Amino acid sequence: MRLYNKKLIPKSEMLLYFCTSKTPIMEDMRFILTFIFLFASVSLIGQSHHRNFHPKTVKIMAVGDVMLGTNFPDSTYLSPDDGKELLLPVKKIISKGDVSFANLEGVFWTGEGEIKKCQDSTKCYAFKMPDHYVDYFVDAGFNLLSIANNHIRDFGATGTANTVRLLDSSGIHYAGLVEYPYVTFEKDGIRYGFAAFAHNKGTVKMNDYANARKIISHLDSISDIVIVSFHGGAEGVAMRHITRETEIFLEEDRGNPYEFARMAIDAGADLVLGHGPHVPRAVDLYKGRFIAYSLGNFATYKRFNLSGMNGIAPILELNLSESGEFISGKIHSIRQIGEGGPVPDKYHRALKEIKKLTEEDLPECTLKIGADGTITRGEEEKK
């Protein structure tokens, strides 16, 4: 029993009394409660809209070439610790990603096998890591690899088949060969699509725009976020600038990275990651989607030129909305020491180089790169 207006009213009649009473007090109460209800409803709608603006943020970590040593032509090209510690200095950063990407610059193949044509095996750049090295990738946090490059066929069909077998068994996703043009996978409720392209034999061709559009558009139709990787552009420090034209190197058509990236985004890509030039290049933003034109040499033990710009690289930390739009990011700078192996660079050389190249090559780009490595969007692009 409750007392209202000094009358005893049974609980069963309270609601009826409240709704039908004509007293001034009850009319005022109904007005106040109606106002509170409407205000609360508007607030909830506003909160719901705010949550849906970026309802879920995903973190992508991305690096360039990884080759942790080769047992060809012999085991002297492997590190003294058998590769165990090469990725440990950067594991904490790499493992932050919902998706952590790299370009696999070689194959996993312990045994002997056919090798690509070489006149002198001591000067032949053919890379095969022992089978158990795949565990080092898993331990570091990598779960997505491009195999579209000039080294995936170094040891013929046998080396390639062994590599994809080990990647499958380890749970690492991959794409880039004619046999494996794309892959989709799900993590934490987000469906990802991934495709990789190159100019090399047996890979999905970067310069075949019609086929690339078809693959990317298909992924866009079945995925929340589409990631595209390409192995293209001329190599070396002298070729680090974006020309916006077709790049020819060693008499090979290495594509037009600037044009390809925009074509990919127009077709449905949300993130475009480049590698191949072996040095860092500029970053870009197109239709709210992030582009990295070259991620450089990240972890390449022996047999690589690591002098100057060849020995520095970024770890990109990219925050995307669940629809793939770029929100914010950070450039973590690394350098390779000794025969190779990444460590954090306190001088932030990769950051400084990428910032400089972006400002020089893409002055219209609205990305803002801070001295601390943070990447934000300019007001023009946000609009």
Which role fits each region the language model picked out?
Residues 2-4, 56:
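Residue-level detector of alpha-helix boundary/anchor positions
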Residues 47-383:
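Acidic, metal/ion-coordinating pockets
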Residues 19-49:
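Bacterial Sec-dependent N-terminal signal peptides
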Residues 4-5, 19:
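Short terminal hydrophobic/aromatic SLiMs and anchors at protein ends
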Residues 7-15, 23-25:
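Positively charged N-terminal leader segments that act as targeting/secretion signals
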